[in-house]
Every structure is written in C-alpha cells, then in structure tokens.
Amino acid sequence: MSSVDYQSLYNTYWQRPDRFGSSSFADATAMARRVMKVAGAGSVLDVGCGFGALVHALLREGIDARGVDIAPVAIDHANATSPGRFQVGSILALPFPDGAFDTVVCTDCLEHLAESDVQVALRELARVARKNVFIVVSTVQDRDHQWHLTVRDRDWWELQAFTAGEGTDHLLRRHPRSLLDVSYEAREHEGPSVTLTLEKCPIAMREWPRERLLKDRGLHMDMLREPGRRADAHLARYVHAASVVRPGDSVLDASCGLGYGSHVLRQCTSGASVLGVDIDPQAVAYAQAAYGESARFEVADATDLSRVADHSIDLVACFETLEHVSEPEKMLREFVRVLTPGGRLLVSVPHDWTDESGHDPNPHHLQVYDWARLRAQLLVAGGADAAKPAPSLDNTLWIEQLHRQLAGGGMKHASAARVIAPLAVNVQDELVEPDLAKSQPTEWLLATAIKSPLAPNSACSPATYRETIFTDASGSVPAGNLASFKRDYENPWLLRSMIALGMRITRPTLLRELARRVMQYAPANSPDFGGALCVLLYDALTTPQAAAFESELLGRVSTLDTQMSRNPHVLRWRVSNWFAAGLLHQRRGDLAAARAAFDRCTAYDVLAFSPLLATKTIEARFRLGCMIAGEDLAGAKRHWHAGVLEAQRVLQADWVNLWGDDQAPLPFALPEASQVIDLAARCAAALRAGEAWRSSPAHALAMT
C-alpha cells in the first residue's frame, strides 16, 4: 500500500489552470507513431493517460487504444471526446487481467511516484502487457520542484525495469527495436527525459534471473537485460548489421552467445531466417529459451561449420569473437565458404585494448587487434597472399566498409560519447591505413566485407543462383520478366552486389571496379554487360571521370545497341543506357548528342520487358520537349503528348510484367508504376502550359 494518496494529489493537479488539458509532449501524433514503429499494430493501453491526447492520436491512426488514469477529472474530460475509452485506475493495481493489451504505454508518469512504488508500478505495466512496454520518464525535477518524486538517470530506470518482475512471469527486457526509436548516438542527447522501449520475456526466463546471468558476465551476458552504455554498444553492432540484411536473407550469427543479437537481427529485418551458433551448450540453451521464437540455435564451433552448406548464408555477423579464438583465420575462411556470392560478412573486434604492459587485461582475449591486423586477416581469408596481403578483385573477399565505435565507460576512452562512424577514406576512396586509424579514437573496429560474385577471370559465379528476394506468394520466382534473373543473366548474383540500389556494394570505387571487371568478361549481348555499363554511366554522372573514359562508355552504348538479342533484360538495359547516355551528354554540354540519345531511348517498345521501363521513355520525352520548347513548341508538344499516351498504353498492358504476382507484388513494382503516372503528369502539365513556354518559360517549367 503506497503512503501517497495519488488520486487526491492528481485530481487537484489536473484542476490547476496551468495544468488542465495539458500534455507532456508537444505532438501526440508523433508520439503515437513512435509507439507504432516499435510495437506495430495491436491493442494499446496508455497508463497515466491524463486528458487522453496519446489515446486520441492512436485512435486516429487506427489503433485500438484505451487509457487509464488515477484522476477522475482527467478521465471524465477524456471520455467526453471518446466515450468508454477511458477509466479510472491506479498504476499500482491496474484494473485489467494479465496480458490484456499488446502494448502498454506510460509517458511522464513513473517519475511522479515515490521511489518505493516504482517497481510495483513496473510489475503492473509488465503484467497487463502481452508483448511490449513503452515508457517515457523524466530524469530532471519538474518546474515546480514538487511533482517528480523519483528523479534518476537512464541506467537506474533500466535496471528497475529489468529486475521488477523477477520471481514472476512478467519479466521485461529491452525491445530488440529499441535503437530504431532512440538511436545509439542519440542516447547521448536525450534531453530531460528518456525512453525505455521494452519487451515481455518468455515465461521460461523466470528460471534465468539476472543474478544467474551475472556469474558468467565476463564471457556472456544478455545485453537486452543489461543497462548502460556498454550494453548499448553491443546492441548497436547488431542494429548496424541489420541495416544491410536484404529481404529474404539467411543470416548466421556466429558465436551468438546468449542469442540476444540473433533476436535483434530477426526483429529488425526482413530476412528469412537467423541461425545462431555457439560452442557453449549452456549459452545455446539460454538462447533457445529466451529467443527461440525468433531464431534457431545450435551448438557449433564457428571454426568448423561443416553442417552449414557452401554458398548457403547471405550474411554472417561475428561480433567480439575473433579475439577469443586461437585461429581467427580459420574461422574467417569458414565464413567465406558458407557465404553466397555477394553475401556480406560483418565482424567486430576490440581496437588495441592493451594496457601499459602491452597486454590485453581481459583473460579471455587471445588476440590483440588494430586495423592493419584485421585487414590482413580478412584479405588472407579471401585468398590474398599471406606474406603480402593486398586488396584485389581476384580475392574472394572484398572489404567494403570500416567503422569505428566508441561507447565510453571502458578502460580506454572512458569519457567518450556513443559513436558509430565510418573511418576516414582518402581521396581515392581507399580504406584508411594504420597510421590514419590511430588518429581517430576507437574502442571497436567494425568491418564489412562482401564475398565476390565472380569466379576468377570470369564474370560468372561458381554457385547456383537461388532467388530469395523477389518472389511470389508461394516463395517462387513470379511469372513475367521482372524477376527472371536466373533465366536471363549469365551471373544473376550480380543483381545483389552490382545492380540493386539499397542492396549492392556501397563503396564507390569497389562498385566501379566490379562493373569494369564484368564488362571485361561478360558477353556484350548479355544483361550483365548492359547492367555494368549502366552502373558506370550513372557513376560518371555523379563522379566525373576522364573525358576519354566517358567517351568510351558512350561509345559502348551504341555498340551494345547493335548486338542481336531477344533477352528481355538486354532490352531493359538498352533503354536504360540510352537514357543515362542522354543525361551524361547533357552534363558534358553536348545537347545535340543528348537529344539523339533520348530519341533512341524512346524508339523501343518497353512492353517487351515491362511497363515499368516506361519511366525512362516518358522522362526522355519530357526532357526532349523541354530542350526544344523555346525554338519548336509544336515539336515539344508532340513529345509531351507522346509521353502522356505512352503512360496510357503501358498501363493497359498485362500487369504480370508490372508486379509479378498480385498476391505478393514485387516491392518496387507499384512505386515505379506511380513514377510512370508522375512523369506522364509532368508531360501533361507541360502541354497545358502552352504558350507560356514562349511568354514565360520559367513559369511554364515551374508548372511541371
């Protein structure tokens, strides 16, 4: 029983003129969307709802939301707007059964409780929640210096949340998507309040209290049940890895420990599956109990993944492991073996944690890393000469990115802020050399490497392609041309590593070199060649190259046009390359050549590939019209009218080549179809501008 009469206190509080009708956040809709970003849809209870601003915002978003508050005056006012959605109740004894709501929200309420009541309230929030608890709590005193009875920092509040339910079936842990709400770096600057985004633990966790976990904390810890910035750092690495997981990916969490990272990878991505392996049977038992609904866990040595087939894993995450093993090179070679062509490997290691004696004081660390050593091991794992490892497209593993990470609170850089940032590159876009790395404070190194999609001296791959991204409702390749990469490409793995935006290699020089290698070895009448050429054309648009090289690329567009082929994807690249050539000619100042390229782009029937390809032909029509409107308005109108009619024509065609499967439309299909309409709308606006192209060309252009 609390010693504070909260009902009398807050009935009076809400009747004050400066408090009546107020809310603790300026934008209730923004807060509602934050809740939805973490919790998704489902029923929501707002505890300490006040006048109901958040509940009303959630209702407007289509969420089944209700509110409860200790103060009748606030509840009466809220029910006047949404009758029956609010009721009087105490956070210390909520009037709802266990698991009554998918998500329980509590904003700016807990700090108003006496410290002795905090854990009781947290247990109640967890009890009535089925899945999620979303808390915002102030960490500073209120303006009147009387209402905030518990003023503590984030770490204290997190620990209370993690321990409040011990001995019950209502334990809480961090939500795996918590860093998607308040990012790792943003936690340094949260201001006067902090957000705790929590998830209900499985009932089996009752057998695993934190005290039991703390006994092995030096080697294993569930960072979703650990407060503080060091735990934030561990979770941030997995969120970083999640950002490059492609839809449909098979993910391996190597040396997964207690499995929290596997859970983050599964809940923060559209990957198809996550497999966590660890050599410790006890760790795997915990992982299965805690996170078995998200991922599959097996006891296995990451240096011997013989049960994992070659070319079967799309992403391997291996964090804080290489320094623990006697043969890190052997482990890295296993990762390369199991990765698919174009698959990614993400590893992290402590960056030179040696003390004054030159030794790492952590007894479990067998290796000491700096960038030079990590780089060399990655290159050797990819086949480079161990005596003189050097980056090369002939290697099987290419280094794509390098990040540094700081957390603060450790042996070194104790006062550092939370940071994950790319390490500097030089003007040639080469990754930093060791002397430069030393000038940037670093606690951990995070490297991203990509497995080559090419066999040696070839544009092909040794692995059989499997489609996991662009599938229909049954998981098969949909009918039509759009996703027929295995049918049409010499090496369909290039789609992921070279072609698809948001999936392909992110380092410009590496992408450029891959495209050049493909053009060197692929047949000129293949979509592989055409796609590589398109990559280089757009690269030249954003990063101008030597004039002779640009001229060579433009000449290749014409050469490709003479190659005989009925391959639909070859047509796709011919249209795209003529359009890109027009843009490049414009940038180079050769407007006559640009008009000729755009004209050639519009000469193809895009329906032999897909209605979506009309984004190129219609924009080409629009650009052609704009280029000649001042001197030949009638000719410009013909181009714009042709653009409008092209949209009408292609959208009347069979939509199998527009979206694949209407039960599971391809993810890019309807957004690109909307671009067809948008571009046609620009042509229509240009037509309607009429004589304004002569009398007020700036106004005419603004209309489009």
Language-model features, listed with the residues they occupy:
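Structural motif corresponding to the intra-repeat A-B loop/turn of tetratricopeptide repeats
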Residues: I505, T543, R588, G630-E631
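Conserved N-terminal segment of class I S-adenosyl-L-methionine
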Residues: M1-P97, T103-V105, S116-L122, D144, ...
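A short beta-strand submotif of the Rossmann-like class I SAM-dependent methyltransferase core
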Residues: C106-C109, L315-T321
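Short, glycine-/aromatic-enriched active-site segment of Class I SAM-dependent methyltransferases
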Residues: V133-D155, V347-Q367
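TPR/TPR-like (Sel1-like) alpha-helical repeat modules
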Residues: D599-A603, K637-L651
